[in-house]
């Protein structure tokens, strides 16, 4: 990470938005969005041309792979990213009024 200008350290997670109305029925209707402030900032800075890196931990699962694909497509350095073999990537359940 010698040439990195900004290192973003922290969380990468999925925001799982439930249906409008406040019902927590995530079995049938929800939308997933890749998120987490440090992950978003790393991608945003890279998109603006800065040399950014993300340091955090993802699960060895399909969501973790989506994050890796996103970081790679944006040019974010993930050489210090940790992949946890037995725990999943975090999901935050969001109830909407």
Segments the model singles out, each with a brief description of its role:
Residues 21-25, 68-70:
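Short, glycine/charged-enriched secondary-structure capping and boundary segments
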Residues 34-41, 63:
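Conserved donor sugar-nucleotide recognition element shared by glycan-biosynthetic enzymes
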Residues 51-97:
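Conserved N-terminal subdomain of the carbohydrate kinase-like
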Residues 8, 35-36, 83:
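Conserved strand-loop elements at the edges of beta-sheets that form or border functional pockets
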Residues 15-16, 40-48:
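Beta-barrel outer-membrane channel/assembly domains of diderm bacteria
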Residues 25-35:
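Short pre-catalytic strand/loop immediately N-terminal to key active-site residues, enriched for Gly-Thr
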Residues 1-23:
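Positively charged, low-complexity intrinsically disordered leader regions
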